[in-house]
């Protein structure tokens, strides 16, 4: 099929497949209520959008949410004001809090790969929510997994999301543009403090793609401080990419950081 269909045709074909799948009666993957398509029921969809929209405050650059306390007047958090990230724009599907965080846990740690199409669709809707109009010359890639995590899981969660997202958007997917600079000595970012994350991420990636695409869409599953995406974006820009967009499934809010 890929031999005689353009990327745009493939994107439309996947939209048809997804539309047909939406008619199949299933249980909501979050609450168990009856729905269709193997995704969220209408109540959970509404709750998802409500939870993202009605937070106390959200940085317009890195999308970090403040779930309590005093509402801020400025649009950017202090880190974004003093240390701007390298990406052009960022879209986030939801905050990494209950109950939606359970979907990521099941997807990553219980090998529920059947959730990938729905999660990628949520990422696409996040891009629409932010008013993105992605360039036709954009190429999709994912943040690579550490070797230890790849051996443990058997798959890269970010790449699984990127595969479906690229299909939905009708964009090309490149799986080998970025690599970890120190895969053997690398330590999971989740075990580092914020300052350690940013220090470690300065030279965390090497560029393997040639020639570079004009515009790149970076895909990751969970954004904590933004150091990993920032480092990957810097690597891409330093090797000739003109603009870097980023989309993540979840963003850790300040109450958890």
Set out the residue ranges of the language-model regions.
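Glycine-rich phosphate/pyrophosphate-handling loop used in enzymes and phosphotransfer proteins
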Residues: 1-257
């Amino acid at each position: 099929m890929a031999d005689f269909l353009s990327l745009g045709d493939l994107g439309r074909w996947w939209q048809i497949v997804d539309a047909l799948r939406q008619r199949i009666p299933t249980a909501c993957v979050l609450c168990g209520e009856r729905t269709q398509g193997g995704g969220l029921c209408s109540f959970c969809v509404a709750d998802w959008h409500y939870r993202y929209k009605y937070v106390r405050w959200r940085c317009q650059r890195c999308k970090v949410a403040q779930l309590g306390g005093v509402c801020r007047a400025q649009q950017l958090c202090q880190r974004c004001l003093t240390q701007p990230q390298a990406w052009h724009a960022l879209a986030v599907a939801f905050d990494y809090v209950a109950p939606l965080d359970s979907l990521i846990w099941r997807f990553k740690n219980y090998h529920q790969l059947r959730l990938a199409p729905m999660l990628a669709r949520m990422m696409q809707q996040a891009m629409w929510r932010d008013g993105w109009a992605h360039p036709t010359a954009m190429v999709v890639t994912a943040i690579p997994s550490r070797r230890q995590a790849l051996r443990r899981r058997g798959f890269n969660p970010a790449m699984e999301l990127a595969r479906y997202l690229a299909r939905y958007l009708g964009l090309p997917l490149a799986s080998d543009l970025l690599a970890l600079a120190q895969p053997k000595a690398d330590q999971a970012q989740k075990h580092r403090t914020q300052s350690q994350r940013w220090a470690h991420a300065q030279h965390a990636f090497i560029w393997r793609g040639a020639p570079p695409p004009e515009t790149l869409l970076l895909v990751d599953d969970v954004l904590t401080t933004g150091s990993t995406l920032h480092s990957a974006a810097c690597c891409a820009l330093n090797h000739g990419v003109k603009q870097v967009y980023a989309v993540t499934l979840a963003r850790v809010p300040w109450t958890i950081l």
